[in-house]
């Protein structure tokens, strides 16, 4: 399971260092150059990564894109072509490249493609919008000293986990198919406390439907 080679890249992994000033998908994927009459991919390699993902061999494993320092530019701008795919109903939506040649106009994003992003929160970065936070899980890596008494058991994986197996456990579509309308009682009560407008409990935190489904899916797995 060699995910990357010596250069830090691989057929199933793409490392994209985000730059300041990206304003649209042309900075991330590329654009159709009408003067040259051809599509001009961005230097990120994202266009080639997506086109290579259409091969039969690439569909059998998970393919990862790492957005390094992702919020140096507004993520909603350069990822605008992908935001609609974060929901189940838009996962198969192709990207319009603007190419007038019909056979090359639409770029399909393989279902086994996933994004991982590293972000910072300081004066050099862009804040994350509520629209983005509602669609993705965010893990804070603040430095904390924790003393754990739990014993963890490690295990080894024999090769790459098939994509179909990962999709069955963690896929967005599976959450919709299983229908998570009924939350466990403890979780429902916790959400009620978050959304209680009692001043003594502090600021109100509204839990969106997407986040509720993500929590329910996590508990189910």
What would you call each of these model-derived segments?
Residues 1-221:
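C-terminal regulatory/interaction module of P-loop NTP-utilizing enzymes
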